[in-house]
Amino acid sequence: MQEKIKKPTNLHKLVILARKNADFFQDLDRRAYARITKGDQRGELYPLDSSCFENWLSAINFKVHDEVANSKLKLDAREHLEVESRLSGKNYNVGLRVISNEEFIEIDLGDQDWKSVQITKDGWRVRAHKNFFYRNNSIKALPVPCRDKLDDDWVESIFNI
């Protein structure tokens, strides 16, 4: 007797699709995130319980399967991926504009290139993010500091202090 081959469910297809296009982890407060991959560049970071993540799920599902994912499918996929994120053991510090410790301060510039100013006891430099930053809708781009034109009040002007 032949075994019946199970056809993948829409949930299974959406979860597989999401895994191919994002990395999943949780922050130190156990909130699950997706880091959307865009080529070699670190892409946007979405909390799984956000409308941004839900919209992203809709977009990738429509792009690949040419159909709209209903609300229940997106909710089920999100819950599935949240559990996977928590069980994966991947935990990272996620900052909103600033992350720091005893050795450095990193300030997200909020630009499209995902650059930040990294400040250490040895100085500062602009480079790709070293850490994870979440950007809500109120985060706007900061001016990129330039060594040649940097005035002494750059930090004060950025933070309005």
Q: For the regions a protein language model found, what residue spans apply to each?
A:
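Long, basic/Gly/Ser/Thr-rich N-terminal segments
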Residues: R42-K130
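N-terminal accessory targeting/assembly segments
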Residues: M1-L73
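P-loop NTPase catalytic core of nucleic-acid-dependent motor ATPases
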Residues: T37-Y46, K121-I161
